[in-house]
């Protein structure tokens, strides 16, 4: 059967989580932590020159090579077994362990999606600052190991913009604020093309919010088991956190009416099974505040997210700036905090308006600058924006014509994966 008649497979590999499913669906079929548990016990066996011992070690190595788990199964296995070590293939948006990444894809395709890779075209995502060599490695693994008929590697920011376009009827010109678990990127896109020289990234992302909440609760002396503290902080972030408009007023509200604003987390200790409770107070608004006042978390980076977005747009070509300010699209789970988009739009609008007023003052009122419209777009599929954008675009006929095929790979080599064309469905 012709692979183009089957739905393409869309896999969005993130630092924290991987989303995977079939083109045409609204939501991914599976969302798994991007982690691999590998049995490395054979490495600790004593080395010996005897043939029998070597054969034993070799057989153990082969068995261990096949004995691995991914996602939640990997996390559970590492807790229950001392022989399995965790490997995180992706760090800060970049693949660092290609062996673990190949194993991860293997399980995704055969164990979860349960499909034959030779029967489907594939769309994979990458970070905006990914080097071309990384695309070549991806192409080699997909074409040689899995023998896929076609592959398209898309920049996740373009897919997020496509998701905003589909749900909000916006242009394919805009700024994507992609806040993932391990990296935050601000990417300007003009008519489907990334303006590479203007990409900005900041070293604060979803995992940093979790670590900050964990630190706050630890300093307050909450009764949380050490081995469970990170997971509790992550769940507190996802369930209770919100973005406030004024941090001082928020402190006052919590102090005046603690019963109204302080929540209680109930958990079970992993080792003993005994129940425990802890209070969740200032963490609810201080967690997301690191994007707007980063100095409360780290002295190494103090530039706010609105200032980074403004700097990104100001470095773009002058004829695209108004369109970029008008379409700022949010993407990623860490943009899902309540009122995050509203706070971002307000703070960015202040920066832009202050520049306009300063410009008018410099000209003495002889030349008046036109107001700049600032619009931050939130949409229903914001959390899975990258995957949903890939699902929509890989459902179009133009997608199959734009993919790098197995025949092209065999003729020209992995270098064909260095670039992927923008196709008509993107704009």
UniProtKB/Swiss-Prot annotation:
Subcellular location: Cytoplasm, Cytoskeleton
Distribution of this protein across tissues and organs: Expressed at low levels in roots, seedlings, leaves, stems, flowers, pollen, siliques and at a higher level in inflorescences.
Knockout consequences: Distorted trichomes and altered epidermal cell types.
InterPro entries assigned: Actin, ATPase_NBD
Highest taxon of source: Eukaryota
Keyword terms of this UniProt record: Actin-binding, ATP-binding, Cytoplasm, Cytoskeleton, Developmental protein, Nucleotide-binding
A single GO molecular function term of this UniProt record: actin binding
Gene Ontology cellular component annotations, sorted alphabetically: Arp2/3 protein complex; cytoplasm
Gene Ontology annotations of biological process type: actin filament organization; cell morphogenesis; multidimensional cell growth; trichome morphogenesis
PANTHER family: ACTIN
Quaternary structure and interacting proteins, as annotated: Component of the Arp2/3 complex composed of ARP2, ARP3, ARPC1/p41-ARC, ARPC2/p34-ARC, ARPC3/p21-ARC, ARPC4/p20-ARC and ARPC5/p16-ARC. Interacts directly with ARP2/WRM, ABI1, ABI2, ABI4, BRICK1 and SCAR3. Interacts with ARPC4.
Protein name per UniProt: Actin-related protein 3
UniProt organism field: Arabidopsis thaliana (Mouse-ear cress)
Phylogenetic lineage: Eukaryota, Viridiplantae, Streptophyta, Embryophyta, Tracheophyta
Primary gene name: ARP3
